[in-house]
């Protein structure tokens, strides 16, 4: 469902899903550390890493799961603080910092 919504948004705006997210959500909310690709995440200086136990004895870094082909279904990388901004918009019916930012 989210993938379909992303494709519809691309068709309506003439911009990629990634461009729409950055311009319409990240920028207005000041979500400067959030990104929408594994490449951006890997280039980040402050990203959490996942680890796994390999063959029951070796702890090793897990590769990031690349889901670019279905990005609108969950390819946003963010911090707790920045996701809290997004949640405030939803909780406050589109308002953020006492200003209307989004119409749902």
What are these regions (language model features)?
Residues 1-104:
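Short, surface-exposed loop or secondary-structure junction motifs
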């Amino acid at each position: 469902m989210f993938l379909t919504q992303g494709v519809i948004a691309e068709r309506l705006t003439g911009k990629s899903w990634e461009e729409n997210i950055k311009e319409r959500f990240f920028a207005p909310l000041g979500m400067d550390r959030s990104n929408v690709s594994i490449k951006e995440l890997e280039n980040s200086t402050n990203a959490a890493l996942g680890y796994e136990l390999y063959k029951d004895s070796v702890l090793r870094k897990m590769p990031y799961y690349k889901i670019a082909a279905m990005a609108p279904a969950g390819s946003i990388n963010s911090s707790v603080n920045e996701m809290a901004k997004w949640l405030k918009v939803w909780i406050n019916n589109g308002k953020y910092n006492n200003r209307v930012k989004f119409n749902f």
